[in-house]
Curated annotation (Swiss-Prot):
The gene is VAP. Belongs to the V-ATPase proteolipid subunit family. This is V-type proton ATPase 16 kDa proteolipid subunit. It comes from Chrysotila carterae (Marine alga). V-ATPase is a heteromultimeric enzyme composed of a peripheral catalytic V1 complex (main components: subunits A, B, C, D, E, and F) attached to an integral membrane V0 proton pore complex (main component: the proteolipid protein; which is present as a hexamer that forms the proton-conducting pore). It holds the Pfam family ATP-synt_C.
Length: 164
């Protein structure tokens, strides 16, 4: 057994997969719930605008997919011992943990932003139609925050060091 590949290294990889999925889905759930409340409130007064105003809910849901992508890639990259010898280095485990944290936490931040903007934006655009384009632009920038985390996570999952 080498200091480069301790038996605890896979724990960090699996934690990376878990935090990517958990935090990204927390953000997606918050964004969906918060903007869904806005859509529901607006739909009482103007039901014809409900389908047009569903964009924040969909954008928040996509954040959960980002976390799922990183979690699956990390989960497939974690290697168990072969013939009693570890095959997964601590460098790789820490890289996978960093990938999960980058994707998960940026997904959570994006979900919070999408929820707040979606709730207020949907209600405001029901009152003043000109605000719809501005709301969509702000939502796109908020979604980009989650996308940045996905990109960094994908780069970090490709980093690995051999055990030899």
């Amino acid at each position: 057994m080498s200091d480069l590949c301790p038996p605890t290294a896979p724990f960090f990889g699996f934690m990376g997969a878990a935090v990517a999925l958990i935090f990204a889905n927390l953000g997606a759930a918050y964004g969906t719930a918060k903007s869904g409340v806005g859509v529901s409130s607006m739909g009482v007064m103007k039901p014809d605008l409900v389908m047009k105003s569903i964009i924040p809910v969909v954008m928040a849901g996509v954040l959960g997919i980002y976390g799922l992508i990183i979690a699956v890639i990390i989960g497939n990259g974690v290697k168990g011992p072969e013939g009693g010898k570890p095959q997964y280095s601590s460098f790789t485990g820490f890289a996978h943990l960093a990938a999960g944290l980058a994707c998960g936490l940026s997904g959570m931040a994006a979900g919070i932003a999408i929820g707040i903007v979606g709730d207020a934006g949907v209600r405001a655009s029901a009152q003043q139609a000109k605000l719809y384009v501005g709301m969509v632009l702000i939502l796109i920038f908020a979604e980009a925050l989650g996308l940045y985390g996905l990109i960094v996570g994908l780069i970090l999952t490709s980093k690995e060091a051999p055990c030899s």
